[in-house]
UniProtKB/Swiss-Prot annotation:
It is found in: Nucleus. Residues 345-423 form the RRM domain. GO terms for molecular function: RNA binding; sequence-specific DNA binding. Residues 335-344 have a biased composition (Low complexity). Residues 13-47 form the SAP domain. This is SAFB-like transcription modulator. Transmembrane segments: none annotated. The lineage of its organism: Eukaryota, Metazoa, Chordata, Craniata, Vertebrata.
Length: 998
C-alpha cells in the first residue's frame, strides 16, 4: 500500500459516496450506522460544528482505488445482467417442469414443501455463511496487517453502500465483496507472506476460489443456474460445510438442546485437532508456497478464462479476493480464541417480513452493539414466503445483549426470533481422491440425465478445473495422511469403502442429507423427506450429488438419523395439531356462518313479520277509513233525508196554513156573498111586494101571459114560498169548497128538517094582508149609507104601471113572487142569519102599512136606496166566483110552469131570449126587462150567483132541475106530475109541503 498515491479532492456533501461519508465519520469518531441520508445529515452537522463548509469538503482519495473499484463494479454489473438473464430463463423452464410434475396429494405436498424449505434454508445458509467467513477473514487480516486497515475499512464501507443501493429486497441480498485495491506486485507479496503460515492447505486454494465464485453467483441469484447445469462438483470449505448443521439447528429450534450440545462439543474437539495440525505443517507450507507461486499465476489466468466462458467476467477479481481472504482466515484459524469468537458473533434472525431490508436489521441490532454485517436471505423458490436474517456482531457481549432484547419482538408487523449461530468455521475434514472422482462422475451423470440440454463449454472448463484441483488435493492429502496416522485410521475405519457406504446410505435413506466438511449437495437430496421424489429443482439443487468427506461421518449420520426421526415425529405431531386447529377453525367458521345465517334469517323473518304487520295495519287503516267514509256518506244521506223531511214538514205546515188562510178567506167571502145575496133577496122580495111592472119580455106573446092576470089566488099559497127563505139560514156555515159533493145529500136533509115547521103555516096567515109577510125593517140595514139617485127608465115605467094599476089584485104580486122564486134561486141560496124569517113579517109596521103601500113612494125609494147600495160591490163578488156564469136563465122557468102542472114547458126559452143579460145581471134579468140598463151596476155578475147556486143545486134535484152544465136552449120535457107545487122557487120540493094553488 506504500506505493499507492493519495490525493486530496474537494467535493460537495451531496456528491459523496457512502464509503466517503463513512470514512469522514470514522475520521471524526462518529457513528457510521445508517443509510446515506442519515450519514449525510450526521456529517453535515459535524462539519458545521467544526466551522467548515458542507459544500466544500476535503477528501483524501487513493488514486488507484477508484479506478479498480469502478472497473470491478462494471464487471460485476455485466456479470449480474448476463447471469440474471440466464437464471430467468432457467427459472421459467423449471417452473414449467414443476407444473408438469405436481401430481401428488395435498398432504404430500405439504410435507415436501416443509422438507424442501428446510433444505433450501440449509443451502442458503451455507452460501450466506461463506460470505460471512470472507468478512471475518478480512477483519482478521486487518488486525494482522495494520497497513491494510484503511483499505479494509474502505472496502467495508463500500460493501455497506452496495447493500444500501442494490439493496435489501425480498430476494437474497448478498453482495459480493469488493476487491482489494493495489497492483499485482503488492498482492503477490501479501500472498507470499500469508501462504508461509499455511503449508498443508495451499492445494485447496483453487477449490476455495471456485467455491467462492459459485457462491457469489448463488447469492446474487444470477449465474447460479449455469454453474448448476454444468455438473461441476462444487466444493465448499470446512468453514462453510460445518454451518448447515447449525443452520438446521437454528431452523429447528424445537429439536432440543442436547443435540446442539453434542454437536458443539464435537466441533470443539475437531478444532483442537486442526489447530495442532496447522502448527505442524507450517514449515512445509512455506516451501510449497514458493514452488507453487508460479503455478498460482497460471491458475489465476485459467480461472479468469473459465469464469468468462462459464458464468461472467467477475471471476478474476473474486478469485483473487477469495485467495486473500481464505489465506487470512486460514492463518487466523490456528488459534482457538479467534475461532470461538467468530463462531459466537453470528445471529440467526427468523420470522422476518418480506419487506425487511438489511439496513433495517442493521439499525435494529445497532442499538445494542456494533454490527459488522447484516444480510437478509429468502427462499429462492418462493420469494417473499420466508425471510431470514444473519447479523454479525463485533463481540459476544453484543450478541447476548441483542438476543436478550430482540428475541420474540416485533419488526414490521412480524414476530422475529433471534438466536445465536453455533458453528465452527475452522473445522475441516479430508476426503480421499477416489471419493472425489466418484462423486464428481456420479454428479455429472445425474445432471445429464435430469437436465437435458446443458452448456458443453461450461462443463468442459469446469471439469478441467476440477481435475487440476483434485490432483493437487490428492498430493497434499498424502502428506497429511502420513503425518497424522490417527486421523487416517479413523477415516479408514469410518469409511472402509466409500462407494459401498454411499450406496448403502442411499438405500437406507434415499433422501438423506450427507453433511460433512466437504458438503456434496446431491440432487437426490430432494428425496430426503419420507422417500418422495423431488417436485422442483431450484437454484439450490446445484450442490446436491456430492460425496460426504469427513472423518466422523458415521457418528454424525447417527445424529442426523436420530434428528430426522425426531423431526419427523414432531413434524407429524405438528401437522396433526395444525390439522386439528384447521378443522377447529373450519368448524368455528361454519358455526359463525351458520349463526350469521340464522341471525340473518331471523332478522329477515322479523322484517317480514314487521312488513306484514305494517301492511295489515295499513289495510286496516284503509278499511277503517273506507268505513268512516261510508258512515259519513250514510250520515250525510240521513242528514239530507232529515232535512228533506223537515223541509216537507215545513212545506206541509205552510200549505196547511195557506189552506187554512184560504179557507178562512173563502169563508169570509162566502159570508160576504151570503150577506149580499140575502140583501138582494130581501130587496127582491121588497120589490116584489110592490106592483109588478109591465113585462115587456117576449114571453108576453105566449098564451101563458095572455091569461087573466088577476086570477084569484089563495094568499097562503101565494106567500107559501116565503117559507123557502127560511132554509137559507146557516146553510153554508160548514161548507168546504174542496168537497163539493159533501152536501149533496145532507143539504136536502138539513133543508128538509129546517123546513118542517113551514109545512103547514097555519090558518092565521090566510086572513092577513099581503105586505105583513115581509119584514118591514129589511131596508133599515143600509139606511146609514147615502142613497144614490137613479134615473132608470124601467123604474119609472114600473112606478107608472103601479100608479095606473092602483086596484090591482094581490094575484099579480103572487105571480111576481113566483117569478122571483127563480131569482131567489139564481141570486144564491145563502140565508142571512141576521134576517129572521117566519113570523117577523107579521110585525105591526107591516100591518100599519098594508093599506097605503101602493100610493106611497117610500117603498120605491127604499128600493132605489137598496139598489144604489149594491152598485158598490159588483167586482169583489165577481172575483170570488169566476166560473159561475151562464146560468141565470136556468131557474126562472119552473116558476111559471108550477102554475100548470099538466103542461110541458120549454126551459131555457126565456134564457135564450135573455142571453144578452147574462154578463151583468143575476136575478133581475129573469124578468125580461130592458137589456143594458143600469141595474147591472148594482147586481152581482151572473157568473157569481147563478153559476154557483146551480152547482150547489144540481146534485140533489131529481125532478125538474137541470144539470150544472150551462146548456142553454136545451129542451126538457117536464111532466106535470113530476114537479110538485112550490118547486118554482128553484129548490127541491119538500115532502108534506102543500101544493100551491093558483
Amino acid at each position: 500500500m506504500a506505493s499507492s498515491d493519495t490525493t486530496t479532492e474537494r467535493k460537495k456533501l451531496a456528491d459523496l459516496r457512502v464509503i466517503d461519508l463513512k470514512t469522514e465519520l470514522k475520521r471524526r469518531s462518529l457513528d457510521v450506522n445508517g443509510v446515506k441520508n442519515v450519514l449525510m445529515s450526521r456529517l453535515k452537522q459535524a462539519i458545521e460544528e467544526e466551522g467548515g463548509d458542507p459544500d466544500n469538503i476535503e477528501l483524501t482519495v487513493n488514486s488507484d482505488t477508484p479506478k479498480k473499484n469502478s472497473k470491478n463494479k462494471g464487471r460485476k454489473v455485466e456479470a449480474d445482467e448476463s447471469g440474471c438473464e440466464a437464471s430467468v430463463e432457467e427459472d421459467s423452464g423449471k417452473d414449467n417442469e414443476l407444473e408438469s410434475q405436481d401430481v401428488s396429494d395435498q398432504d404430500g405436498n405439504d410435507e415436501l414443501k416443509d422438507s424442501e424449505e428446510n433444505e433450501e434454508e440449509s443451502a442458503t445458509f451455507v452460501n450466506v455463511l461463506s460470505t460471512e467467513e470472507e468478512n471475518e477473514t478480512k477483519q482478521t487480516s486487518h488486525f494482522d496487517n495494520p497497513e491494510r486497515g484503511s483499505d479494509i475499512q474502505a472496502e467495508e464501507a463500500e460493501e455497506d453502500e452496495k447493500k444500501d443501493v442494490t439493496g435489501s429486497g425480498d430476494v437474497t441480498q448478498e453482495i459480493s465483496k469488493p476487491l482489494h485495491s493495489g497492483d499485482n506486485e503488492s498482492e503477490l507479496r501479501i500472498k507470499e507472506e500469508m501462504e508461509t503460515s499455511t503449508s498443508l492447505k495451499e492445494a485447496e486454494d483453487d477449490n476455495v476460489s471456485v467455491t467462492i465464485q459459485a457462491e457469489d453467483a448463488i447469492t446474487l441469484d444470477c449465474d447460479g443456474d449455469d454453474l448448476l447445469e454444468t455438473g461441476k462438483n462444487v466444493k465448499i470449505a470446512d468453514s462453510e460445510t460445518s454451518k448447515p448443521k447449525d443452520e438446521q439447528e437454528a431452523s429447528y429450534p424445537k429439536d432440543g438442546l442436547e443435540d446442539q450440545k453434542d454437536l458443539t462439543s464435537e466441533n470443539q474437539k475437531d478444532d483442537k485437532e486442526e489447530s495442532g495440525k496447522g502448527d505442524a505443517v507450517k514449515k512445509d507450507g512455506r516451501e510449497a508456497s514458493k514452488k507453487t507461486e508460479s503455478g498460482d499465476k497460471d491458475k489465476d489466468s485459467q480461472k479468469k478464462g473459465a469464469s468468462s466462458t462459464g458464468a461472467s467476467g467477475q471471476a478474476k477479481s473474486s478469485s483473487k479476493d477469495a485467495k486473500e481472504s481464505k489465506s487470512a482466515s486460514k492463518e487466523d484459524k490456528g488459534s482457538t480464541s479467534s475461532t470461538s469468537g467468530s463462531s459466537t458473533r453470528n445471529l440467526w434472525v427468523s420470522g422476518l417480513s418480506s419487506n425487511t431490508k438489511a439496513a433495517d436489521l442493521k439499525n435494529l441490532f445497532g442499538k445494542y452493539g456494533k454490527v459488522l454485517s447484516a444480510k437478509v436471505v429468502t427462499n429462492a423458490r418462493s420469494p417473499g414466503a420466508k425471510c431470514y436474517g444473519i447479523v454479525t456482531m463485533s463481540s459476544s457481549a453484543d450478541v447476548a445483549r441483542c438476543i436478550s432484547h430482540l428475541h420474540r419482538t416485533e419488526l414490521h408487523g412480524q414476530q422475529i426470533s433471534v438466536e445465536k449461530v453455533k458453528n465452527d468455521p475452522s473445522k475441516r475434514d479430508i476426503k480421499k481422491d477416489g471419493d472425489e472422482k466418484l462423486g464428481s462422475g456420479r454428479t455429472s451423470g445425474e445432471r445429464k440425465s435430469s437436465g437435458g440440454d446443458k452448456n458443453s463449454k461450461t462443463q468442459s472448463s469446469v471439469k478441467k478445473d476440477d481435475r487440476r484441483s483434485s490432483d493437487k488435493a490428492e498430493k497434499k492429502d498424502g502428506k497429511e495422511l502420513k503425518k497424522d496416522s490417527k486421523e487416517k485410521s479413523e477415516s479408514a475405519t469410518t469409511v472402509p469403502s466409500p462407494e459401498s457406504s454411499k450406496k448403502n446410505e442411499e438405500r437406507k435413506k434415499p433422501g438423506g442429507k450427507s453433511p460433512g466438511p466437504m458438503v456434496v449437495i446431491d440432487q437426490t437430496k430432494g428425496d430426503q423427506v419420507y422417500g418422495r421424489p423431488p417436485i422442483r429443482r431450484g437454484r439450490f439443487d446445484k450442490m446436491r450429488n456430492r460425496e460426504p468427506f469427513f472423518q466422523n461421518k458415521m457418528k454424525f449420520r447417527e445424529f442426523r438419523d436420530r434428528k430426522d426421526i425426531l423431526t419427523f415425529e414432531k413434524m407429524k405431531q405438528q401437522r396433526i395439531r395444525e390439522k386439528v386447529e384447521r378443522m377447529e377453525r373450519i368448524q368455528r367458521f361454519r358455526r359463525a356462518v351458520e349463526m350469521r345465517r340464522s341471525r340473518e334469517m331471523a332478522e329477515r323473518e322479523c322484517r317480514e313479520r314487521e312488513r306484514i304487520r305494517i301492511m295489515r295495519e295499513r289495510e286496516e287503516l284503509d278499511r277503517l277509513q273506507r268505513e268512516r267514509e261510508r258512515l259519513e256518506i250514510e250520515r250525510q244521506k240521513l242528514e239530507r233525508e232529515r232535512m228533506e223531511r223537515e223541509r216537507l214538514e215545513r212545506e206541509r205546515i205552510r200549505i196547511e196554513q195557506e189552506r187554512r188562510r184560504e179557507a178562512e178567506r173563502i169563508a169570509r167571502e162566502r159570508e160576504e156573498l151570503r150577506r149580499q145575496q140575502e140583501q138582494l133577496r130581501f130587496e127582491q122580495e121588497k120589490r116584489n111586494s110592490l106592483k109588478r111592472p109591465r113585462d115587456v119580455d117576449h114571453r108576453r106573446d105566449e098564451p101563458f101571459w095572455n091569461e087573466n092576470k088577476k086570477m084569484a089566488v089563495d094568499t097562503d099559497s101565494r106567500f107559501s114560498h116565503g117559507s123557502d127563505f127560511n132554509r137559507q139560514q146557516n146553510r153554508f156555515n160548514d161548507f168546504d169548497h174542496r168537497d163539493r159533493n159533501r152536501y149533496s145529500e145532507g143539504s136536502n136533509v138539513s133543508s128538509f128538517e129546517r123546513r118542517d115547521r113551514f109545512v103547514s103555516p097555519g090558518e092565521g096567515k090566510k086572513g092577513r094582508p099581503t105586505m105583513e109577510n115581509f119584514n118591514k125593517n129589511f131596508t133599515d140595514s143600509r139606511r146609514n149609507e147615502p142613497a144614490q139617485p137613479r134615473n132608470d127608465p124601467r123604474d119609472t115605467d114600473r112606478r107608472e104601471v103601479r100608479d095606473q094599476d092602483d086596484r090591482r089584485p094581490v094575484g099579480i104580486e103572487r105571480t111576481g113572487g113566483n117569478r122571483n122564486d127563480g131569482a131567489s134561486h139564481d141570486r144564491g141560496r145563502l140565508g142571512n142569519p141576521e134576517i129572521q124569517h117566519g113570523r117577523q113579517r107579521d110585525s105591526g109596521n107591516n100591518q100599519a102599512r098594508s093599506g097605503t103601500w101602493k100610493g106611497e113612494g117610500g117603498i120605491s125609494a127604499d128600493k132605489r136606496e137598496a139598489r144604489g147600495e149594491r152598485t158598490d160591490r159588483p167586482t169583489r163578488e165577481s172575483t170570488g166566483q169566476p166560473s159561475r156564469g151562464g146560468h141565470a136563465s136556468r131557474g126562472g122557468k119552473p116558476g111559471y110552469t108550477s102554475r100548470d102542472g099538466d103542461r110541458s114547458v120549454i126551459v131555457g126559452e126565456r134564457g135564450s131570449s135573455g142571453q144578452h143579460f147574462n154578463e151583468g145581471r143575476q136575478v133581475v134579468e129573469r124578468h125580461g126587462r130592458d137589456a143594458g140598463g143600469p141595474r147591472k151596476d148594482w147586481h152581482a155578475p151572473s157568473s157569481q150567483g147563478s153559476g154557483y147556486n146551480a152547482r150547489r143545486m144540481s146534485d140533489g134535484r131529481s125532478g125538474g132541475m137541470m144539470s150544472s152544465n150551462p146548456a142553454i136552449n136545451r129542451v126538457v120535457q117536464m111532466p106535470g106530475g113530476s114537479m110538485q107545487r112550490g118547486s118554482g122557487s128553484g129548490f127541491k120540493s119538500y115532502k108534506g109541503a102543500p101544493q100551491r094553488r093558483y
